[in-house]
Structure formats: C-alpha cells, structure tokens
C-alpha cells in the first residue's frame, strides 16, 4: 500500500513512474562522429565573425516519427535540421543550413506535433517555417517588437497560438489563423513591459494591440524577457533579466487595455542573497506542476505551481551560470534536469534529489549554452558550446571498446557532491504534506 501511495505522490508532483535510468545516464558518451562544427556560415551575413558562429538554440522535434530530428539555430541567422540517428562519416563538419534571418536567432521552438517551427531573432521578428526532408519554407513573419526577440513558445498542444518575449520587455500573443490586412500579422494581445513599470502615452485602447509604444517612467528601464512557458492554455509564466521576479499571467485578460503596470495573478520573488538575480530560462515538468528556473546566482530553483507557494521548493546547484545564454531543460519523464554551464560542462541532476548534480558531461572546452533532450525513447542529449561545436550524447556500451581512446570524445562522469548548508531545510522529494510547508519558487 505504501508503494502505491508513493507512486501516486510521484505522479502528482511530476516525477512520473519510478523507473531508474541512472545506469543509462552514466553510460552517456559523445563519439568522435557525433561532434559537429555548428551550422555553416551564412554567405550573405553582415556580421564580421572571426570564428564560426555559435549555436544559440537547439531543440528536438515533437512530431511523431521525427523525434530524432534536431533543429539548430545559429548566431548569424541560419537554421539547420540534423538527423541524429545518422553519424557523420566525416566528423567535425558544419551542418548545411538555411538563412532564416539576417541577425542572430536566440530561440527556436517546434509547433506541437508538426514539422513546423518558430524562430525568434535579433532582427525584432519571429518567423514560422514549414520543414520537410528537402527544404525549409517560410510561412509567415510576425513583427511588433522594438528590440531583439529572445524567446517564443507555442501553447501546449495548440498548433495555432504562440507567445513571444523580447528585450523591449513586452510579451505578445499571436494566433497564426487570424487574417490581417496586407497579410501583416498583429498580436492578439500583449503585456507591455511585463517585468518593469510603465505608463501608456496613448489614450487609444483596444483588445487587439496596434504595436503602440509605451515609455518608461523616469528612473525605470525595460527588463528583457528571458523565458516563457505555459502552465496551461490560459496561464503563462515569464521571467526577466533583471527584476528578480517570476510572473504568472492569466492570458484570458486583456492587459493592453490598462494604463497602469500590468498585474500578474501570481509572482515569485527572488529569495537568494546574490546581486546576480536575473533568470536565464524556464522549464516545466510533464504534469505542469513544478517549475524549474535557472538563475544567474548559480542555482536552479524549483517551485510548486499547484500552491504557488512563494518560497523555493528545492535548489539544484553545482554548475556556473555567468551569462544569459546558459539554458536548462528536463528529461521527457521529468526525472532529470539538464543544464549548460560556464565551466565547460553540462550537468545532470535527479529532480527527486535536490542539491548537487549526479553527473557532468565532459568534452567541451568553453561555456555550454543550449541543451536539449530527445522527447522519446533511449536518452539522447544535444549540447551547444562556445567552443564552436555541438555534440550528440548517446548511451554507450557497458564495457569500453578497443578504440575508445580515439572514438570517444566525451563522457558522463559521476559526481560526489557535499550537501549545501541550506539543503537540510529542503525536502529531497516533494510530497502532499510537503507542499504545505516546503519552500517553493
């Protein structure tokens, strides 16, 4: 009976079934043929790069039958698709790409269940693309932001609605089905300066924004939107670069008709003591009950979305986060947390055991930034790095091969981590009763 209750609690808190994949994670290997030099250089790029452009974003497809397809987005505005089941016959080559923007692409996200994706770029636009085995075709371009678009994400299981966030501090919601004059899409709604204080300079109110501009109150500045994730169809969670606040928004409201500062329905304020309280990315567990927030203070905080408790439920540490390019994600079952790091490694934690990581992926030589986990099947991980290479990590053989010293270019190494002083105050595994007293972000 106790085991049944434990399993029900794990399901409720987003940890899925009690399958132990630690052995598979321990055997993750990057082979020589799984090391790639990013995406080929844009021949028409206006950027004067003295090195290969970095990969800024990578995501595995969620479309049935295409789960092994990895989308890559580069610093000079190109996107590429990689079949990760195919190992390169000539390693360390660049992937052939398509020019999507003439500026950096900061984020890329797949349309749920489709071979279509959106790209968020430094040229202030979001673009929707149709992908097949032969070509990448532009469907539409979405313009309304004033600054670099940092992130864009679809609503869960919705192929028509997505949101975007930018350095202008604004969040826009777009419906790709909407018809617009001259085929110039406008957002359905918006949250202006979502992580700062603003005043509206126009008296024109409308439920559908017209990309009107708002100015900041003296002494304030727009805080860049760095992460967006939907909890459900009507609830959006956002984080910013400098205000130290996670905000939960009711997207059924029309925030654009209000002249005052937009008010979220819940907020989670930074509880640490560091001056580096900007957030770099958000991840949500499969049951959408636990939020993981990567912070510049070198801690990933988890928060309870069923109670919206103000305090962190748990903390995961041991990596270094010294830039807004360091991202994190979860394994498909929510049992593992993966993050890039400034110290040349990617780190893996067991979500049911907060504290230090259990493994680190060794092989890169600079800051590891974007990371991705294949959505189905045996663990396959992608990591991008400022050393100019991206790597594919697979479950290797249990025993070392004869040519491992040549063929293996990276391994998962176990980590023995001492408990953080604060960790004794945190529950190692969330429980029903724990939700009432545990610290949540």
Describe the residue ranges of each PLM region:
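Structural hallmark of WD40 beta-propellers
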Residues: 65-71, 114-118, 139-140, 158-163, ...
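Beta-strand-rich domains and repeat architectures in extracellular enzymes and scaffolds
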Residues: 47-77
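Loop/turn segments within WD40 beta-propeller blades
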Residues: 59-67, 108-114, 153-159, 222, ...
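Terminal intrinsically disordered, low-complexity extensions flanking WD-repeat/beta-propeller proteins
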Residues: 1-34, 38, 184, 188-215, ...
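Conserved strand-to-loop turn within each blade of WD40 beta-propeller repeats
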Residues: 73-76, 120-123, 165-168, 176, ...
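Per-blade loop-tip surfaces of WD-repeat and WD-like beta-propellers in eukaryotic adaptors/scaffolds
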Residues: 36-42, 81-95, 102, 114, ...
């Amino acid at each position: 009976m106790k085991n049944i209750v434990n399993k029900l609690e794990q399901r409720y808190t987003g940890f899925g079934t009690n399958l132990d994949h630690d052995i598979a994670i321990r055997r993750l290997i990057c082979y020589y043929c799984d090391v790639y030099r990013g995406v080929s250089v844009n021949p028409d790029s206006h950027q004067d790069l003295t090195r290969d452009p970095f990969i800024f974003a990578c995501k595995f497809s969620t479309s049935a039958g295409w789960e092994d397809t990895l989308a890559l987005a580069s610093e000079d505005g190109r996107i590429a698709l990689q079949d990760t089941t195919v190992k390169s016959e000539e390693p360390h080559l660049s992937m052939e790409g398509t020019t999507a923007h003439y500026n950096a692409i900061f984020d890329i996200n797949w349309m749920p269940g489709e071979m279509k994706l959106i790209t968020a770029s430094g040229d202030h636009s979001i673009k929707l693309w149709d992908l097949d085995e032969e070509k990448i075709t532009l469907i539409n371009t979405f313009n309304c932001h004033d600054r670099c678009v940092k992130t864009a994400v679809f609503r869960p299981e919705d192929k028509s609605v997505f949101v975007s966030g930018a350095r202008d501090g604004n969040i826009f919601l777009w419906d790709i089905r909407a018809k617009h004059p001259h085929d110039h899409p406008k957002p359905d709604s918006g949250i202006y300066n979502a992580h700062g204080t603003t005043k509206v300079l126009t008296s024109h109110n409308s439920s559908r924004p017209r990309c009107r501009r708002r100015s900041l109150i003296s002494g304030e500045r727009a805080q860049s939107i760095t992460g967006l994730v939907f909890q459900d169809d009507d609830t959006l969670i956002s984080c910013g670069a400098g205000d130290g606040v996670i905000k939960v928004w009711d997207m059924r409201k029309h925030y654009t008709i209000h002249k005052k500062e937009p008010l979220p329905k819940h907020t989670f304020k930074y509880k640490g003591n560091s001056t580096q309280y900007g957030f770099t990315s958000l991840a949500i567990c499969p049951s959408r009950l636990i939020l993981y927030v990567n912070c510049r203070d070198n801690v990933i905080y988890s928060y309870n979305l069923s109670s919206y408790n103000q305090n962190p439920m748990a903390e995961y540490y041991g990596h270094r986060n010294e830039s807004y390019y360091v991202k994190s994600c979860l394994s498909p079952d929510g049992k593992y947390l993966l993050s890039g790091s400034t110290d040349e490694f990617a780190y893996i934690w067991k979500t049911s055991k907060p504290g230090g990581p259990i493994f680190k992926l060794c092989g890169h030589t600079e800051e590891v930034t974007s990371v991705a986990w294949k959505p189905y099947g045996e663990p396959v991980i992608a990591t991008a790095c400022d050393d100019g290479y991206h790597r594919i990590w697979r479950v290797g053989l249990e025993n070392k091969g004869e040519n491992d010293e040549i063929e293996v270019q990276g391994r998962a190494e176990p980590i023995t981590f001492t408990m953080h002083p604060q960790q004794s105050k945190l529950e190692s595994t969330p429980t029903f009763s724990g939700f009432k007293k545990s610290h949540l972000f």
